[in-house]
Structure formats: structure tokens, C-alpha cells
């Protein structure tokens, strides 16, 4: 592009915020023009994040001082409940918005208010938001003024299911079970006891067993693609003793004798961030660390009619900031891979 995209990041002091800063620094067509934080206003980005020394000369500003309305696009990497208050004004001024929180993901307002425990401040804008699962909604994302970036668990679980659901290959009335594990960074950067090394290290536990906020988000995607499946969906997340990474093991029943691996390969043939592994492979979280990739394998369980799908992503990249940059590329007519060519880190 002859003119760089001017980007702003609201709430840039969390893990998704610094991941956006890292990825956008390597993007040839983006200039990060504003980064905001009420608590760190006046602090240089490079002082707050030493990993970005020599990369950014910006300082954090309050949202009111940052000139966000002069940006082409603004990313909200904020806690739930912020974007729904601040995004409408920017959209009215012609700024395109990608919200990495959950404010615009769930279309049914009472459902959202039930799971997130607050009154929605911009219910009229929810219907205009495009759900930014890039590989599902490319055409709509390209035209969007507001993109609701998916959650990490919904991304990891939905990507292997989308091709099968679109062809109505899942068997109605049967359980669809997602057994998921996340690294501790998924809990965010704010201090809490459960994220302490002495609590999360050398330990493994389920959480949200009574119901996780990502459950209605995943069910919404399922219900929009095939009838009779969402009602049988069961989702249990676990906290794994690692920093980054997400692993989903999904158990499903197919309605016919088709080869699901072929269905996935055909659907994702032109999707550069999707890697369908050979049958019998077991994708590992370390194989996607730091990269905007989703690796998937699928095989039939021994002596059973149950199929087992394995899906891995980096929860901070494909599960958050990387998918947001991918959506930005689509919105501005760029190649999806632009600025996202990083190779996974190993070890």
C-alpha cells in the first residue's frame, strides 16, 4: 500500500495488547499511531515492555488524549464492558473497529447479559457486528465497520467443526464434546491467585464446569451452521501449566460414512493459517507457539463410531491478536498473511 494504515490500540498493557504491538511492528503496511492505558498514561511503551525497546517511541495516553478518531482502525484489547461504551463514537466518526473482548460476539442480548453480568451499553450495534472467525466469515469481515474478534476457546473448537457443520455432516441428537486446555496467559495479565506460579505450576485442573462464558459463543456458531447439534454440545475448559497454547479434543458423531479429513482439507485448501495433519498425527501446542496457525488432526476412535478431533492454537495469536490482524488485513483488502508470516518458536 502507498499509504500506511493508522492503527490505535485501546488497553495495550495486557497480554493481547502487547501481542498486537509485537505483530503490528512487523506489519509493512501499518503504523501504530496511538496506544492507550489509563493506569500507565505517560509511560513509554518501551519502558513498560522491555521486549519492545528500540521498536516503539510511543508513550501510553488516556483514550481521550490519544486522537483515536484520527486512526483508520482501532483495536480494543480491553476487559469486557469497555468497547461497547467507547466503540460507537469511533464508528460514527468513520473509524473501523476490531473488538477483542466479548462485547459484540453474542447476538442475543439477554444471553450476553446473563453470562457477562452487566447491561449491554450498545445493543443496537450488536446486530451490525461481524463475528470475526476469519475462515468462516471472510466476505462479511471485508465489508465490516465493526468486527467481534472470537474468543480463544471458540476459535480452537470451531475451526475444526466449521467444514463439517456447513455440510451438515454431524449426527443430530448426539453429544458433541469439547475437552479443552489453555495456558495461563488466557487468564489475562491482572494478578490473581490462580495464576501464581505456585498455584498453576506443576498442576492441572478443570474450571468453569458449571458453565463457561465461551459456551454460548461456540453454541451460536454451531447453531448457525447446522440444526440439531448445539443442544448436545458440552464444553469443559482446563488450566494447563504452560504460558501459551490451547488444545481442544473434540468428540463427535458423523451422520454418514464420509471421510472428515477430506472435508476439512477441501474446505481449508485456500486458508494459509490452517494445517490439516495426516491421519494419526497428534498436533502439539508448541508447534504453533507465537504463530497465527491452527493445526488439526482427525481420526476415528478404535472400535467406535466416535471421531476424535485434535486442534491446537496459540491462544494469544490465532486465539486473539493474530486473528485480529488477519481480520484487519481482510478489511483493508490485503493478503491475509501480510505481517503474519512468523514461524512458530521451538523450543
From Swiss-Prot:
Catalyzes the NADPH-dependent reduction of N-acetyl-5-glutamyl phosphate to yield N-acetyl-L-glutamate 5-semialdehyde. Belongs to the NAGSA dehydrogenase family. Type 1 subfamily. It holds the Pfam family Semialdhyde_dhC_1. It comes from Neisseria gonorrhoeae (strain NCCP11945). It comes from the Bacteria. The active site is at residue 152. SMART domains: Semialdhyde_dh (SM00859). InterPro entries: AGPR_AS (IPR023013), AGPR_type-1 (IPR000706), NAD(P)-bd_dom_sf (IPR036291), NAGSA_dehydrogenase (IPR050085), Semialdehyde_DH_NAD-bd (IPR000534). One of its GO terms (molecular function) is N-acetyl-gamma-glutamyl-phosphate reductase activity. Keywords: Amino-acid biosynthesis, Arginine biosynthesis, Cytoplasm, NADP, Oxidoreductase. It catalyses: N-acetyl-L-glutamate 5-semialdehyde + phosphate + NADP(+) = N-acetyl-L-glutamyl 5-phosphate + NADPH + H(+). Pathway: Amino-acid biosynthesis; L-arginine biosynthesis; N(2)-acetyl-L-ornithine from L-glutamate: step 3/4. It is an enzyme of class 1 (oxidoreductase). GO terms for biological process: L-arginine biosynthetic process. Its main location: cytoplasm. It is found in: Cytoplasm. This is N-acetyl-gamma-glutamyl-phosphate reductase. Its EC number is 1.2.1.38. NCBIfam families: argC (TIGR01850).
